[in-house]
Amino acid sequence: SLEEDLKRRDFTINAMAYSDRTGIVDKFHGVEDLQSHIIRCVGVAKERFTEDALRILRAVRFSAALDFSIEEETLQALTELAPNLRKISRERIQTELEKLLMSDHPERAELLFFTGIIPEIFDGCLQVTAQESLADMLVQLCRSPKQHYVRWSLFLGGLAYEGVLKSLKFDNKTIRICEKYHAYRQEKLRADKSA
C-alpha cells in the first residue's frame, strides 16, 4: 500500500505523496517539517539508519542542501550508529560527500566531525592539522567556489588525508589535482607565517 511504501522512506520530508483523489498524502508530518526546516526520520530513527547506514550521511547532506537542522532523536541516532557506515561501499559514501561539499551550505560538514562520522568513513583519520583549524576549514569551504577539486582539497586539508581520496575510489586525475592544490595551499600557509 501507499502508506507502507511511505513508512519505509528515510525522512519525513521524503515520505509524502500526491493522490488525484485526496491530494497530498502526508502521514508523517513532512509538510510540517519542511515548513520548520527540520530533517527527521520516519518512525524510529535507529531503525531507519539500521536499514541503510547511508541514510546517516544523507541526513547531513540534506541538512546542507536545504539549510535545515537535524531533529534531536535523529541526530542522536546517527551519532550512535555512525560505526555502521564502515559497511557502506566507498563509492556510495563518496557520492553523498560530494553532494554535501557542493551544496550551498558546505559548512554543515561540521556535523561529520561532531557526530563521529569522520573517523568511521576515513578509517580513524580525525587529525585536524596544526596549520588549519576546523573552523578555518569551514569558513574557507563557505567562501570557496563550487568547484569539485577546490572543495575537496579544502575539506581534506583539515585532515591527515594520506590515501583518503584513493580509499573513496576517486579517479587518478582528481587525486592528482587535489594533492597539488593541497600542496600549494600548505606552501602558501608556510610562506604567510614566515612573512
Tell where the protein language model's regions lie, with residue ranges.
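Catalytic cores of the polymerase beta-like nucleotidyltransferase superfamily
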Residues: 1-195
